[in-house]
Amino acid sequence: MSNASALIRSLLIYGLCLPLAVFLGYLLANPQDFTTITVVTVVFSVLIFPLLLRWHHAWLIATWNCTAMLFFLPGKPAVWIGLAAASFTICILQYALNRKMKFLHAPSVARPLLFLTAVILLTARATGGLGFKMLGGDTYGGRRYFVIIAAVMGYFAIINRRIPAKRVGLYVTLFFLGAATMLIADLPGRVSPSLNFLFVFFPVDNLAAFTNQNSVVAQASVMDRPGGLAMVGLGCFCAMLAHFGMRGVLDTRKPWRLGAFCFFVLAGLYSGYRSLLVVLLMTFALLFYLERLHHTRLILPVILGSMAVGGLALLFAARLPLTVQRSLAVLPYIQLDPVARMSAQVTSDWRVQMWHDVMPLIPQYLLVGKGYSFSGAEQAQLVKDSLGSTELAGDYHNGPLTVILPFGIFGSIAFIWLLVAGIRVVYHNYQFGDPAYHNINIFLFAYFVVKVIFFCTVFGSFATDLPMFLGLLGLSISVNGGVAKPVFVPQPKIVFNRFKLHPSAHRPVGA
């Protein structure tokens, strides 16, 4: 009987799979057709749905900073965007079926986040809609709205449940190491063409590398900046500090940690981004202070090591690779190659000029922001001007400007409210969280504060940094099961009993 059941089951499976495979093969003959994309998406979703029910929370956290993309969808959105939408939908359905499966309690973040989302949607409605050109619309700019909405859904999906205690370290490590996939964007032209299939799943930083593989004349560049190395260095830097803490990284009994830490820092500096050096130094200094290491005997080795590194930089900085010199251009009193110094100065002047041009626009968009939408005619008019096209896209390379110009004063108020509430949440989890997660909580607090300061003073982009801020907040809340609160230990109250005699009263008179 069992053999007959197995045979019937096999026949049913083959009867469903074979016609489906033939039908998909027929559709894939025209892969760009909308019907093909729709059918493939539906089939893929049905097949992966059982796995999503079990692992959607873990997958969302692991891919939050990953650059992998859903190549078969219009616009090729990132994998984390698709997982955010799927995970949020699953969480809503689970709560509708079981009221006990509530989201973790963090109303202090939910209120400003919902207010900010409402401001963004109303601004989009008032300035021409979302503008999905990739879906056949007449306007551009909808991709950034799409990313912002996905980040909001992803935040609520992350705080849907608490991370299991045994997997907290793994989830946090995967969260930060996902940024290392950015290195794949720099591989074209550096790896064998047989590995080009990777670039179907991951975005490419420079398409010219593909043309140069079969070209006799290649494009020469004075300074090639591999941006993926910056994300590798930053991701490993964050993962090590979150896992070991500053005290653990500087532990002399395990020197491999400090060696690996320095290696990843140098790898990041090889990317040529000055902003990375600023973030690393600020995070290192704040963590060193928060862990009270300046009150320990580590303070002297750190001071001597810093002086030694500074002295070597003053003497030999001009002999380092140009990209490393460009990263060090933010430091004063260092002799650098004129090429590296000029490259850094040109970008600084370019940004200052752009800020000077857009600052007069603030009163115009103070009440109602300009949004992200713009027409194809506007793009064609400014396509020859790199500065004009950057301003049109809202990429001002300045955090406050990327908030107040697109979304006005109300968007700025909502975002400031969100940042203040976020700092309060990570601070409470750092102060009153589970001692087992002390290294994670103290790093999340320090890193969040550093990113807020960096966003407001050095460099920032609202559409890019909002997912980062919400990811850090969601991770902190999910690790601690909400917002930690101080535990009040009841103190015994001493009450004098006036009817009870002192022990000396019971002694004999002659004693």
Where on the chain are the PLM-derived regions?
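Hydrophobic transmembrane alpha-helices of multi-pass, membrane-embedded glycosylation machinery
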Residues: V42-I48, W64-A68, L83-T89, C262-V265, ...
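Structural signal for the C-terminal ends of transmembrane alpha-helices
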Residues: V46-W55, T89-K102, A157-R167, A239-L250, ...
